[in-house]
């Protein structure tokens, strides 16, 4: 069991867990099992807070004032009054400073979900069950002729599974389920998937925040990579994990920007007009020469794989070192591939100097 030590940890976790309830509310069986608890509603923000309480009840996170702040930020993370009847918007946070931090979480959620669109979203017209609608691949919306019809529906989707090399290939959506196709997620599969996640979470035993965050992050990726973030649109091709990861990265970088510029202490509200973020791009040079130099025909494939793996490990190690120096989290590493890495930073003078 570990204890939260600072608001940076709270903000990073709040971003990662704010929409966790969109994972558990996909199963009516799961929701039914917790209805004995005294909640006025079982909307996804309430289920997100329920997960934080689960971590506390299972002695994974120690009770503290910071943990109570985390519960409040996860519960009230919407700018709009979409849940006004049950007081789940940011403006319902009573503590003024915490409310300003709540606005950072809400803004980061909006940035990640692209909720501020110039054009209205075309919502699902086929009355597909939002609870069982699977994640669609992005490939059907790729076009070299720029003639993608945004109102079309997807013919392929990912089957519900933990992340593995076989599961990453999408299946055709049909009226019947067989080896090469299926008609969508099923309630019993969703419930089992969620229960398996919770069983693995219970095994986390660490007195270190960093170790806990890494384990939580990897388990969320393992189970939520195939869960669609938004199931109200025709093609749901953004996973819940990717939305939560990017929200966490944006929230932490934004919080550090506002904190280092004393914006929160001065009582000012976070603003979308200021440039809060920087993207650091790194490139490990000389990769091609390193990989192909001295390659012999015998055992060439094994040597190439080994050298490619080494390059990946080097770029990962550099990225991890950088986020440690900037006091950021795993979520701030946007991508590491091909000897390159992309990291989301706060746009501050201190960051630029580093």
Predicted regions and their residues:
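Conserved helix-loop-beta segment at the catalytic/binding core of cyclic-nucleotide signaling proteins
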Residues: 319-343
């Amino acid at each position: 069991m570990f204890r939260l030590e600072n608001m940076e940890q709270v903000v990073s976790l709040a971003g990662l867990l704010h929409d966790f309830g969109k994972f558990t509310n996909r199963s009516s069986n799961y929701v039914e099992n917790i209805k004995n608890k005294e909640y006025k509603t079982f909307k996804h923000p309430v289920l997100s807070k329920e997960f934080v309480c689960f971590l506390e009840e299972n002695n994974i996170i120690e009770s503290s004032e910071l943990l109570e702040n985390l519960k409040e930020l996860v519960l009230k993370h919407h700018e709009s009054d979409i849940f006004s009847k049950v007081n789940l918007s940011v403006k319902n946070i009573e503590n003024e400073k915490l409310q300003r931090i709540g606005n950072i979480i809400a803004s980061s959620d909006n940035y990640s979900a692209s909720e501020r669109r110039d054009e209205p979203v075309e919502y699902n017209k086929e009355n597909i069950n939002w609870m069982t609608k699977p994640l669609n691949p992005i490939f059907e919306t790729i076009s070299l002729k720029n003639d993608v019809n945004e109102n079309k529906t997807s013919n392929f989707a990912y089957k519900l599974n933990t992340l593995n090399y076989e599961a990453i290939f999408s299946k055709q959506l049909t009226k019947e389920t067989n080896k090469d196709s299926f008609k969508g997620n099923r309630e019993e599969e969703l419930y089992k998937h969620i229960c398996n996640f919770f069983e693995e979470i219970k095994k986390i035993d660490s007195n270190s925040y960093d170790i806990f965050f890494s384990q939580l992050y990897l388990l969320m990726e393992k189970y939520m990579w195939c869960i669609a973030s938004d199931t109200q649109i025709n093609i749901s091709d953004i996973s819940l994990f990717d939305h939560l990861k990017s929200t966490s990265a944006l929230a932490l970088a934004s919080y550090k920007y506002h904190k280092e510029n004393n914006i929160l202490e001065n009582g000012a509200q976070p603003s979308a007009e200021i440039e809060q973020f920087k993207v650091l791009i790194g490139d490990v040079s000389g990769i091609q020469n390193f990989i192909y130099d001295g390659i012999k025909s015998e055992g060439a494939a094994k040597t190439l794989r080994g050298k490619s793996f080494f390059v990946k490990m080097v770029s990962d190690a550099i990225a991890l070192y950088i986020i440690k120096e900037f006091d950021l989290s795993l979520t701030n590493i946007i991508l590491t591939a091909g000897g390159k890495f992309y990291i989301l930073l706060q746009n501050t003078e201190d960051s630029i100097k580093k």
